[in-house]
Every structure is written in C-alpha cells, then in structure tokens.
C-alpha cells in the first residue's frame, strides 16, 4: 500500500477513480515539490474502486493507497483524510487540472496559523484559468452563482467555492464533521468552515485543462443542483425564514386592510375573494416560518448547524396552548357573532358583504390556533429529545 512516512508535516490527499492517465504526473509533481522545498510529506491516494491499474501506479511511485468502498467524491476524500498522518492536509484532484507544485502556498498559510485555506482559480482572487480548462457554464454561471450565494448564506469572503485544491488542519477537519458523500462535499466544507468560524484565507491557483482523454466525473446540472441543495439545507434562514417572512407580511397586511373594507386601485376592486387569496398567502407564510423554526431546531440538536443566538421557545407546549387558545377564542367569537346575525334573519340568506369577511377571518383564526397548539407539542417533543441528548453527552 506504499511506504508510510514517519511524522510527516503534510499529507496530500488525491481522490482517485480510474485516473491512470494522469495520476503519475500528479504524484511526481508533489514529490518534486517535497524535495524542492524540503517538505516532509506523504501522499495518500484515496481509491474509490479503480479498475485501470491506478493503485499500482500510485504504490510504485511511493504513495500510500487507501481503498474506499463507499462511492462518491466526498466519500473518497473522507476516507483518505481519515487515513492521513500529518497535522496539515492538502486535497487536490488527480486529473492534472491542478498543479501540485503550488502546494507551498497552502503550507505557508497553514504554518501561519490558518485552519482552512481555499484555492482560488479566478482572476479576482489572483488565480488563472487556462484556455479550455473550465466549461463556459461553470465559469460564468455555476461557480459565480454558488459563490455569491455562499457569501450571502454563510458570510464568507471566498471568491471561488468550487476550487478542488484546498488545505486545512486535521483538527479543523474533525471540527467540521462533514457528512456528504458526493460532489456537494466541497460546498459543505466551505459552509461548515464559515459556520464554525475557522481562521481562513484564500490563495491563488492555476487551473489547467483536464489531462484525461475521457469525460470528467462532474455532471454540470446534477452536481450543480446537489451543491445548491446542500447549501440551502444548511441555511434555514434563507430557505424558510426569508420567504416565510415575505409571504406573512404581504398576506397579513392585505388581510388586515381587506378585512375592514374593499380596496380600489385604478379601477380594480379588491374585495372578499381577494381577501381569501391573501389569507391563503398569510397561512402559507406562517406555515413556512414554522417549518423553518422546526428545521433550525432539529439541525441544531443534531449538530448540523451551530446553535443560534436566539432564545429558544420557552415552555413550547404551554406557549403554543396559550397563543393557540387565544386565536381559537377570537375565531370562535367571530363565528358566534355570525351565527347571531344568521339567527336574526330567521336562518335565511345572509348579506355576503356584511358577514363573509368576518366568517373567513374567524375560520382562519381557529385553524391557526389549532396549528399552534399541536406545533407547541411537537416543539415540546424536540425539547425533550434535546435534553436527553445533552444528558447522554460524555
């Protein structure tokens, strides 16, 4: 499996799946760098089931081969990193698109007390993309969009979240507690590094055309979606709270206005039917906010995201029962008043313009009240689970 270096300073991890065409070049460049800069380092090739002899190529050149049965880019890297012996780890693809002679930049940053070091291929971060090295959609749509969203969601300042060459300390990797098996592993790493406030920086790298004759493992739309999906899952604020808040405010304001009187705007009259539409929007917004609160609570309890600085919902069962009961009482009062109006006309036809507004608002209050009561019990269950987990934490 290759000779193990005693007490290396740096482990270079290369995920590998049938990379016989380019693996030797990557290993030789890394060994050349170790010699030129007097770096005590080891190379770990995380093999994900190659059938083209990649394992023998790696071992013949002195790399340590770590078989990883679980398939996927992230799975291979996790297996290789777990086997690393050094305190500093640098990862890079084995397709010769990254020049491993650039790793001294990463090592220098790690030696200067950085926990996480991202490579940047874009000129904005000092990097360079050689002609033909990156597809048009990746360069001008996919990576810029994902990078911008990452800056908004996780408040990092990286200019290239998809760069495959990056470095970190073994301790930082353990703190990140990454879970993804696929290509989204790269996005999860950046998000987690930002969320747990690792000391981070970015160094320029050059992206070269892929040295293989076959198609790359990356699939533009499938893997792009997987990156975006994972970023959203790790950011309940933007997935739930922002849309929920917008819909709740829009629906709530318009419901209050139309519950009192019709509204005419440039000859267009918004009346009872429009009121019901905005009630639906308000209800959807509140639902999304509740889902977001539940999602955040669950993610925090399972250490998927850091604990928030917001105060938890104190006594959720009692709070849900109190507010839910209040809305139900108000709703029931409206229904009783509507019933009295109906009785006054001998249970005959009612004037719609007088009663339907109150009737729909009353129904909405009862539905919302019932939901708050049962959501309170659900939060109470999560609260019990959280306390149990804390009690069993060593």
Language model segments and positions:
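N-proximal low-complexity "stem/linker" segments adjacent to membrane-targeting elements
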Residues: 1-32, 39
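Hydrophobic helical membrane-anchoring modules
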Residues: 1-7, 155, 178-394
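Residue-level signature of catalytic and energy-coupling elements of molecular machines
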Residues: 12, 30, 80, 95, ...
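Donor nucleotide-sugar binding loop of glycosyltransferases
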Residues: 19-22, 50, 73, 99
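Conserved donor nucleotide-binding strand/loop of the catalytic core
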Residues: 37-44, 55-83
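A conserved acidic beta->alpha catalytic loop
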Residues: 47-55, 96
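Acceptor/aglycone-binding surface of glycosyltransferases and processive sugar-polymer synthases
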Residues: 68-83, 88, 100-183, 210-230
């Amino acid at each position: 499996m290759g000779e193990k270096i005693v007490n290396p300073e740096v482990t270079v991890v290369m995920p590998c799946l049938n990379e016989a065409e380019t693996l030797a070049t990557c290993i030789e460049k890394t060994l050349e760098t170790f010699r030129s800069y007097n770096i005590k380092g080891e190379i770990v090739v995380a093999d994900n089931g190659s059938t083209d002899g990649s394992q023998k190529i790696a071992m013949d050149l002195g790399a340590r081969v770590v078989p990883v049965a679980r398939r996927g880019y992230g799975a291979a890297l996790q297996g290789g990193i777990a086997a690393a012996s050094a305190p500093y780890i640098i990862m890079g693809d084995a397709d010769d698109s990254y020049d491993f002679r650039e790793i001294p930049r990463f090592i220098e940053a790690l030696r200067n007390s950085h926990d996480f070091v991202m490579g940047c291929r874009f000129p904005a971060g000092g990097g360079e993309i050689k002609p033909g090295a990156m597809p048009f959609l990746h360069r001008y749509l996919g990576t810029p969009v994902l990078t911008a969203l990452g800056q908004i969601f996780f408040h990092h300042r990286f200019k290239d979240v998809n760069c495959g060459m990056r470095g970190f300390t073994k301790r930082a990797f353990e703190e990140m507690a990454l879970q993804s098996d696929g290509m989204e592993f790269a996005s999860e790493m950046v998000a987690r590094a930002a969320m747990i406030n690792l000391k981070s920086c970015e160094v320029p790298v050059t992206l070269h055309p892929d040295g293989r004759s076959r198609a790359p493992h990356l699939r533009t739309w499938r893997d792009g979606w997987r990156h975006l999906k994972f970023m959203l899952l790790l950011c309940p604020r933007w997935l739930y709270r922002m849309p929920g808040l917008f819909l709740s405010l829009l629906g709530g304001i318009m419901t209050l206005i139309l519950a009192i009187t019709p509204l005419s705007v440039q000859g267009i009259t918004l009346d009872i039917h429009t009121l019901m539409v905005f009630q639906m929007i308000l209800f959807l917004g509140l639902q999304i906010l509740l889902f977001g609160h539940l999602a955040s609570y669950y993610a925090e309890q399972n250490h998927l995201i850091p604990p928030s600085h917001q105060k938890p919902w104190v006594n959720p069962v009692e709070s849900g029962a109190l507010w839910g009961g209040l809305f139900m009482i108000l709703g029931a009062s409206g229904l009783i008043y509507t019933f009295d109006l109906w009785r006054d006309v001998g249970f005959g036809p009612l004037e719609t313009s007088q009663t339907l507004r109150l009737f729909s608002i009353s129904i909405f209050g009862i539905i919302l009240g019932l939901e708050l009561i049962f959501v309170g019990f659900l939060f109470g269950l999560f609260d019990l689970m959280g306390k149990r987990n804390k009690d069993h934490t060593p």
